[in-house]
Amino acid sequence: QALNDKYPAKETIFYLFYRQRQWNTVERKWMGWERKRGKLEEFNRLLRGASDTSFVTLDGDLSVLQQTRFIITLDEDTQLPRDAAKRLVGTLAHPLNQAILNAEGSRVIEGYGVLQPRVSIAITSACRSLFASIFAGQTGIDPYPTAVSDIYQDLFSEGIYMGKGIYDVDTFMTVLDGTFPENSVLSHDLLEGSHIRAGMVTDIEMVDSFPAHYLAAAARMHRWIRGDWQLIPWLFRMPYNAAGQRVRNPLTLISRWKILDNMRRSLVPPAVFALLVAGMTVLPGGYGRWLGFSLLVLATPIILYVTDDLRTNWGLLATGSLRWLFPHLRIMFHQMLLSIILIPHQAYLMVDAIVRTLWRLSVTHCRLLDWETAADAERRMRVDMRGYFRTMWPALALAVGATGAIVLTAPMTLLYLSPLLLLWLSSPYAAWLVSQKNTIRPVALTEADKQELLKLARSTWAYFADNVTIDDHFLPPDNYQEQTEATTTDSATDNCLAHRTSPTNVGMYLLSALAAYDLKFITLSDFLYRVSKTLETLEGLPRYYGHWYNWYNTQTKELLSPRYISTVDSGNLAGCFIVLKQGIEEFLQLPDSTLALALELPPGSANQAQQLLERREECQQLMNRLMARVMEMDFKLLFDEKRQLFHIGFQVEVAKLDDAYYDLFASEARLASFIAIAKGDVAEKHWFRMGRQLTQSGDMRALLSWSGTMFEYLMPLLVMRNYPGTLLDETYTAVVRRQQQYGVEVGLPWGVSESGFNARDQQFNYQYLAFGTPGLGLKRGLAADRVVAPYATVLALAVDPAGAMRNIATLKSMGAENKYGMYEALDFTSDRVPRGEKFAIVRSVMAHHQGMSILSIDNILQHNIMQERFHSEPM
């Protein structure tokens, strides 16, 4: 009901069903009828008006569901990406994909009754352990340009249904009603897909989880093998139906081959292990030949992968660069090594599953529906070292048996084969070791470092504390510039403040206020007051399609010319509003006593309860207003539907979009793209339309940006999570290392980004430019300037905390520290350095750089709290 209240519609759109367990006389237990297969069959009947199912409806009127045409099936741990459901429905509803049945109505002969999308592994799941990262494969790959080939779909126009997809309800019921006998089918997906004809749609993706440890993966594999071998009856001409009658098998030869091929794959580990042992003991020709052949079987996936990678990356091969291949080869090598170590247990596992199934099929006829969810299996298992040895003892027995056989038949080879035998004997330990949960490394900061960062954050916050006042309508002035002899003229900026502001400035100020509260610089009351006053001013400013303009006068609230809407600025402000809303929501979760203390309400006062109620209501209203402003920003205004890219901005006065685009993934506009997709303003495919050109930086890959600035790479990281093992994660590390390397090359501190530099206009204001690191940006002439921005180093705290602290200390020793944290930049460019000096200090601070610095420090000291807040928003 809460979901229906949150997403109101003309009719109920959220329903909750559960099935009552029934006593199964064959299995001798209370269970849902026919497990998942029965759940789908009964649910289909329920949608068509049946009242004799075991479903219990908890909420909702079922009459509106009787016209349901398609059902999408998901597991609990399956994620359905945005627009995937719409695309699945559109594909299955296409006239050319409509199911056509044979004369008997027992099989779909043209079109499709079910579609199976591509299933990828979630990045977070693949990073849970070394085992998962090795066997989960590549994650986070774009399904649009990388739609994979499926041999069955390519050759026979039908694929394999794996249980996560979309099916036609009427086709399902017509073909499968009464088809399968009870208490016999565990792996129903392949069988159902073979009857109603499954189509593979590999350009549509679902995201699934992967077991974190080996024992859970082994248990899942055991269950799959049992399910596959229980389909033996459907290899023959006359299987039984639900009525217990033998009927003609409608499955095609290729469908039966799919069943047989699954069974064949389960025989590979036992066959390889048997070949290894036989080759080391009794087979002619020497153990080396058979060992090499067995290893070749295990290495076949690596060989196929490498040849395919070489084919698709022939351009890189022609340049002589093979470094891009090494990470993939390393993973494939680890896969082969673990496969060798675990082959005894894998062989035992397969044989055990096969023998159990054959025994139950032919003798006991029970426990054929023995099944446990992967999540329950993971929770039940003992995953300490003792648990691994207790579970994997058959592997040790097989290893000991193989050793004994070698001693008896070929003792002279024992010395040469001992490394392999020792690996087998250590297999429980190896499985336990690679299954250890990956833990987040503690930030490499000492207590002294943390105190130094707190001090830096406090002085940086002082810029906003001093200058965001009623005189500027609680808007942050764009920058502060220290007066020098050159600026003490009548033309100097009044009070050294630039009384103008932008959406990015405002967003960074508001999140800086939240960070200041996190770090105990201000009280909760002060924070709420600041947010309320700034939001009040913002809501009174002119906007365009929900977007704030690029520049306003903070003292008069006048719109500054030229009137312009910036894509990046709108994305930054929207992202800051989302984080701010989640930060305020945290206060509503506090108990009354804690909230009263945070608000400094007098203890025991008679009206404390009323004040608390009012403050909670104030927080709720602030949250609603913030999200309303986000939803009002129409990002379609700035989007090119044909190119699927964002323009740099919109020139309001001439009603013209800029000719240039944000076409690189390594860009500060990544946050705007993410939010626009989350809002539904633009399609998901835009995310994959941005360019991902790579450059080699040392032994790592990095995405190319336009200017090679730290700002482009690391600004989105202030609120967006980083996932280990991804291309972005590798890019962050490579970029910081390259910046550090470049600093060493030119003999300067590192940290290059867009910033002010030591050149002034007629009003003696510092000029501003994007400075980058050669090798990271496409822009030419990046090596011509030598400008170091301290805020760039503070941003790098998220990637290399220890290295950033050392560089901050170096910058401070050079005079970069001031009352508002650190100066804007140090300019080492020779033609801009005063005579007799080694560098010029750009004696200014900029509001958005101040905000980025505070957020970066807050994240490093508060365990990425801003990122967690941003990703907590359901939208």
Functional labels for PLM-detected ranges:
Residues M385-W393, P411, L415-P419, L423, ...:
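Ser/Thr/Asn(+Pro)-rich, low-complexity disordered segments
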Residues Q22, P143-I151, P181, E205, ...:
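Membrane-proximal soluble regions of multi-pass membrane proteins
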Residues I166-V169, S187-R197, P211, V247-R248, ...:
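Long hydrophobic segments that form regular secondary structure
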Residues Q1-G244:
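Internal catalytic domains of large membrane-associated glycosyltransferases
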Residues R264-H365, W393-R441:
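Membrane-embedded multi-pass helical conduit in multi-pass membrane proteins
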Residues R35, A243-A271, F326-Q346, L361, ...:
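Loop-to-transmembrane boundary segments
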Residues A2, T25-R28, L46-I72, I100-L101, ...:
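Flexible, glycine/threonine-enriched loop-and-boundary segments that flank and lead into catalytic domains
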